């Protein structure tokens, strides 16, 4: 399983616009082959900070995701919205156990 975690930031005054754009990319991505989870969450204590968490069946499927038209659109829209402080990492995980 592939785990993607990270964060990025929008100016708090741009968050209404950013939410509309994020909803589109999240909905499209969740329907992709190999996507187990795809989530963006707003930090409650830090306005404008978005936490990213994704789970994919394979690196190949994650790579295919990065080549989709909706990701190309997201990449240009997020720049236009002033995305900053982007930090995303990819990990390979073994079998998980419940806490």
Predicted features along the sequence, with ranges:
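Short histidine/acidic/glycine/proline-rich micro-motifs that form metal-
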Residues: 9-10, 95
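Glycine-rich beta-strand-turn "strand-cap" elements at beta-sheet edges
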Residues: 40-46, 74-99
